[in-house]
Amino acid sequence: SRGVDINHNFDAKWQMVVDKPSPSKYGGEYAESEPETRAITEFVRKEQFDMLLAFHSQGREIYYDFDGMTGENSVEIAKKMAEESRYAVCIPTGTASYGGCKDWFIKEFGKEGFTVEIGTGQNPLPMSMLDEVYDENAKIALCAMHECAYN
């Protein structure tokens, strides 16, 4: 996509990352400059979700914060998801903390948003890890659905 890292093209301090086309971390000429980003944001705006999970690889971490903003129950929900999956709960730092889908969702809607960094090891993750990664992240997704339904 023209050297734009879609992970940093969302309107949430997207300009804080790399400022020219690059294999990674370039946020684009402007927020939502890429059709993939616009497709996601238009869909989310239309559907008005209560919570958002953005899955990336890798790190076995759950991020819940954007620029000091969190949804009302974000920390508590992140801890529950971490308990289910054995992932760590983290606040992103550096360029990882800007321009992402979760960041935009928190900024735009003030609701719980999470980035789940799946698996560890090489990138991309090998197919041999599929069952393990699926099991861990199915638990995270089920926990999130439970929180949306009952809280």
Language-model features and meaning:
Residues 125-151:
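His/Asp/Glu-rich mid-to-C-terminal helical/loop segments that flank catalytic regions of hydrolases
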Residues 1-75, 79, 84, 115-129:
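Active-site/substrate-binding loop(s) of hydrolase catalytic cores
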Residues 26, 30, 63-64, 87, ...:
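Sequence-level detector for tyrosine residue identity
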